[in-house]
Regions:
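Short glycine/proline-rich turn/loop motifs
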Residues: 171-188, 206-207, 321-324
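Active-site-proximal helices and loops of the catalytic beta/alpha 8
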Residues: 11-14, 18-29, 44-50, 54, ...
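Core domains of carbohydrate- and sulfate-ester-processing enzymes
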Residues: 128-178
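Boundary/entry segment of secreted carbohydrate-active catalytic domains
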Residues: 18-40, 180-184
Length: 514
């Protein structure tokens, strides 16, 4: 039997294992702590993420990057590597290592945002204007710290006049030309593959659980396969022997382009951008969309196969108009809708879920475009990123939004753990924007996104008893701080949700039972 399983695993190939996030203690959801300092992430793992049941953290790129002063220290400078030294606005290598160990020690996995398609922009100049002082020349395409020289870039392969990607309808230029002017690495070269693999392996050996691989649409699947094939197994201090790194690849596929997500399925998971774009449209009730249409949410909506998907309501790009998704994306700027959309995602079984944790910036729209979409994290005048202070009510200060700490979202991360592995069940809808569904007999959630009250008795599939709603409050000792839901011996319960409630949804689960 054992041999059979081993043989089957070998047949599936190593890559099948790169779809597994290796989460621990029955935890399921990850959170993107966008632009957080390593020291703050370490503290957050210990004081909040582990006790709240979060499975992992996506961290901002840890490599050294170009310093951009105009605009002043934009968040996106971190997507322009100048060396693979582990030194950034989030902290140095020592702080990174300390964070990875401390998070692992409390069972929270670290997933690294790996920017390996390119180095800095072609107009990045020459000098030591890297966050930790490494010298480089964008003009001569030299990055001696790695080292990469002009031989390691793709320009000879690119056939557009500008050297940039001009037409997403041409797969060759999407892979071989410069993405918004960023110096494009020649990943077909064994030398480049080796340097990228060394970078990833250093992080794997330090204890990370995997990677969000940036800009995969712009890399050939065959090149990625070669690089992934060189990755070490995860560090056995924290993971079982033979564990492959979890890989989730950023490919924006909303349809209509020659490059599809499908080309990357065998290599790892892929970001499902249709998910947040559609969910936003539904909760905003645009284009005639209704929540009741989500009965077949998931593959039934034309999303990728469930085992391939990494899902999210918003990400660091589309919450500020970068990348794809457009105006429908719901972010913390629309808190009521955002909480509902995130709760829907966390209640639903489709995909590996990622929660966004943002910083605030001064939004300033001119003709529909945010002039300040570049603004970096809360920082001191000298560009140093500010720590994340925790207020007495458990929210964050100094411009850090901390959506993952909002009671409704945190409690739904717990809900997802409690119902893990249970089937989508007991669907109900009013043919409009009131819907309900359960997860086996372990959890049940009811949404009212109509402009009128919800007042209905539903089959929850749950054992009879008194349950605390984990949205308006939660279980606290022998009582509930919010609504109490009484489930009868027949599994039926009465729900009442005013459209004017602060939150127009209710959720109960096995562990919120009194
Ligand atoms: C500018 C001009 C170019 C010109 C170039 C000359 O616009 O026409 O050729 O100068 O050097 C920044 C600037 C951009 C600038 C570029 C190079 O915004 O104007 O080009 O730097 O200096 C982030 C930001 C980008 C930013 C980039 C690098 O979103 O604005 O570019 O970091 O700092 C596609 C991709 C997808 C991508 C998405 C945004 O398929 O992969 O666009 N998403 C990922 C990340 C994203 C990141 C990158 C990829 C690049 O999630 O955050 O882009 O690593 O859909
Ligand atoms: Ca490329």
């Amino acid at each position: 039997m054992h041999l059979f399983i081993l043989a089957a695993a070998a047949l599936l190939g190593l890559s099948a294992a790169q779809h597994n996030p290796h989460t621990k203690h029955g935890r399921t959801a990850m959170v993107h702590l966008f632009e957080w300092r390593w020291a703050d992430i370490a503290a957050e793992c210990e004081r909040f993420l582990a006790p709240s049941g979060y499975a992992g953290v996506q961290i901002s790129p840890p490599h050294e990057n170009i310093v951009i002063n105009s605009p002043w220290r934009p968040w996106w400078e971190r997507y322009q590597p100048t060396s693979y030294n582990l030194c950034s606005r989030s902290g140095n290598e020592h702080e990174l290592r300390d964070m990875i160990s401390r998070c692992n020690n409390v069972g929270v996995n670290i997933y690294v945002d790996a920017v390996v398609n390119h180095m800095c922009g072609a107009s990045g100049g020459e000098g030591s204007h890297s966050v930790c002082g490494s010298w480089f020349s964008a003009n001569r395409k030299e990055f001696p710290t790695i080292p990469f020289t002009h031989w390691d870039f793709n320009d000879h392969k690119c056939r557009t006049g500008s050297g940039n990607i001009e037409n997403y309808g041409d797969a060759d230029q999407v892979r071989d030309c410069r993405l918004v002017g960023l110096l494009d690495l020649a990943m077909e070269k064994d030398y480049v593959r080796g340097k990228v693999a060394d970078y990833l392996n250093k992080l794997i050996d330090m204890g990370v659980a995997g990677f969000r691989v940036d800009a995969c649409k712009h890399m050939w699947p065959g090149d990625l396969s070669a690089v992934y094939g060189r990755m070490h197994n995860l560090n056995t201090t924290w993971f079982s022997g033979g564990s492959r790194p979890f890989v989730f690849q950023e490919v924006i596929d909303l349809g209509g382009e020659p490059i599809t997500s499908r080309e990357y399925f065998h290599l790892g998971r892929v970001t499902e951008f249709k998910y947040g774009a559609k969910l936003g449209t539904i909760f905003r009730k645009w284009n005639g969309e209704k929540l009741s249409y989500t009965k077949s949410w998931g593959e039934g909506w034309g999303f990728m196969p469930e085992g391939n998907a990494l899902v999210f309501v918003d990400n660091h790009d589309n919450q500020r108009g970068h990348g794809a998704g457009g105006a429908s994306i719901v972010t913390f700027w629309d808190p009521k809708l955002h909480k509902m959309a995130v709760a829907y995602m966390l209640a639903h079984p489709y995909g590996v879920a990622r929660v966004m944790s943002s910083f605030r910036w001064d939004r300033h729209f001119v003709n529909g475009k945010d002039q300040n979409d570049w603004m970096g994290p809360p920082s001191h005048g000298n560009g140093v990123t500010k720590p994340v202070p925790i207020n007495s009510d458990q929210t964050c200060g100094d411009g850090w939004v901390c959506e993952h700490r909002w009671r409704q979202i945190k409690n739904m991360a717990v809900f997802r753990n409690v119902v893990n592995g249970q089937p989508h069940a007991n669907w109900w809808d009013n043919q409009s924007n009131q819907v309900a569904f359960g997860r086996g007999n372990r959890g049940f959630i009811v949404f009212n996104n109509d402009d009128w009250n919800l007042d209905v008795t539903l089959n929850t599939g749950m054992p009879g008893g008194a349950y605390c709603d984990v949205i308006s409050g939660q279980k606290d000792g022998g009582g509930c701080t919010g609504k109490l839901i009484q489930v009868g011996g027949d599994g039926r319960a009465h729900f009442k949700i005013s459209n004017r409630d602060e939150d127009t949804f209710v959720a109960i689960h096995a562990e919120s039972k009194l």
